[in-house]
Amino acid sequence: MAKRDYYEVLGIDKSASENDIKKAYRKAAMKYHPDKFANASDAEKKDAEEKFKEINEAYQILSDSQKKQQYDQFGHAAFEQGGAGFGGGFNAGGFDFGDIFGDIFGGGGFGGFEGFSGFGGSSRRSYVEPGNDLRYNLEITLEEAAKGVEKTIKYKRTGKCENCHGTGGEDDKMKTCPTCNGQGTIRTQQRTILGVMQSQSVCPDCHGTGKVPEKKCKHCHGTGTAKETVEKKVNVPAGIDDGQKLKYAGLGEASQNGGPNGDLYVVIRIKSHDIFVRDGENLYCEVPISYSTAVLGGEVEIPTLNGKKMIKVPEGTESGKLLKVKGEGIKSLRGYGQGDIIVKITIETPKKLTDKQKELLQKFEESLNEKNYEQKSSFMKKVKKFFKDIID
């Protein structure tokens, strides 16, 4: 029987976010949870079991960005046994089918649910918790953000102990956890007004693995971890914006119970610029021009990220006018298109004039009339009409 599409199994489309995928999994998994079929017929139990396995298989693939990418490209063939470059098929053994119910019910499971015990399978449910994610703020210049740059960062993290290879045991020797008898979880009961409520939580001694060291590692004292400094080259793509993150899977902190490392998130912080203000892919700047250039028009030099550029200022330019310089902004992070530079013109009033300059300016002013001042002329006409209406 051909496998159903994983997106169809969870009732979502390919554009679904990580949060949407998790919500869809919760809904589907709870619908076919074993506790809901405790009194059902054998046929109904078998059908629910198959659907439940199918739901968890779909979630394991779609919740992992790398596996999701492989599935989107190759479909189910990406995970078939012997598939080239993908290392075998789906393995439910290492997947925590109950973790989603712990999210909902505070770690207590759903009615004592452990693995596939509701379907007659093994009751052992080990819980492998990943290491913590790390965040690193990387400060770069606007020019580096525009053109892309390679940076080397150093950060401290909790890594795996080299002596015990992360097991916490001297010579890697482990034994069954006596607290949980190798189950990885402990169960407690509490009397409430609704009756006896049963909950399940991760074993505090083995952290869900079901194993503890026969003898604690002398280097890490049984934690399986050690502090270390990591050096990493970070390739910052051209067009990246302030606050955007670069994710490096597995470069976060090590797990204390043999689980996968957390992830490293490099958060980009762009330094403020002396000339430009960025808005998306556009750059804004103010360029002061002389009074005569504003009146007569001309060319002015402006800065760009690629060097100097001359732009034309039209005759009679007002202060505050915006001039667009196409294609001199930031390249799109998606790889197509480029923003513009938006130049805001400001007219600088000359100061510290000599008597001769003042005299020449006065004569020039006297030579002008209403036709030379369209806005002033229009305003004065409105003022005259305003007072005329009051008097009438």
Swiss-Prot record:
Main location: cytoplasm
Gene that specifies this protein: dnaJ
Domain of life of the native organism: Bacteria
Assembly information from the UniProt record: Homodimer.
Zinc finger motifs (CR-type), residue ranges: 148-229
Similarity comment: family membership: Belongs to the DnaJ family.
Repeat positions for CXXCXGXG motif: 161-168, 177-184, 203-210, 217-224
Keyword Metal-binding among UniProt keywords: yes
Residues binding Zn(2+) 1: C161, C164, C217, C220
Organism annotation: Fusobacterium nucleatum subsp. nucleatum (strain ATCC 25586 / DSM 15643 / BCRC 10681 / CIP 101130 / JCM 8532 / KCTC 2640 / LMG 13131 / VPI 4355)
GO biological processes: chaperone cofactor-dependent protein refolding; DNA replication; protein refolding; response to heat
Protein name: Chaperone protein DnaJ
Pfam families: DnaJ (PF00226), DnaJ_C (PF01556), DnaJ_CXXCXGXG (PF00684)
CDD domains in UniProt: DnaJ, DnaJ_C
Cofactor note: Binds 2 Zn(2+) ions per monomer.
GO molecular function: ATP binding; heat shock protein binding; unfolded protein binding; zinc ion binding
Summary of the function given for this chain in its UniProt record: Participates actively in the response to hyperosmotic and heat shock by preventing the aggregation of stress-denatured proteins and by disaggregating proteins, also in an autonomous, DnaK-independent fashion. Unfolded proteins bind initially to DnaJ; upon interaction with the DnaJ-bound protein, DnaK hydrolyzes its bound ATP, resulting in the formation of a stable complex. GrpE releases ADP from DnaK; ATP binding to DnaK triggers the release of the substrate protein, thus completing the reaction cycle.
Domain J, first and last residues per copy: 5-75
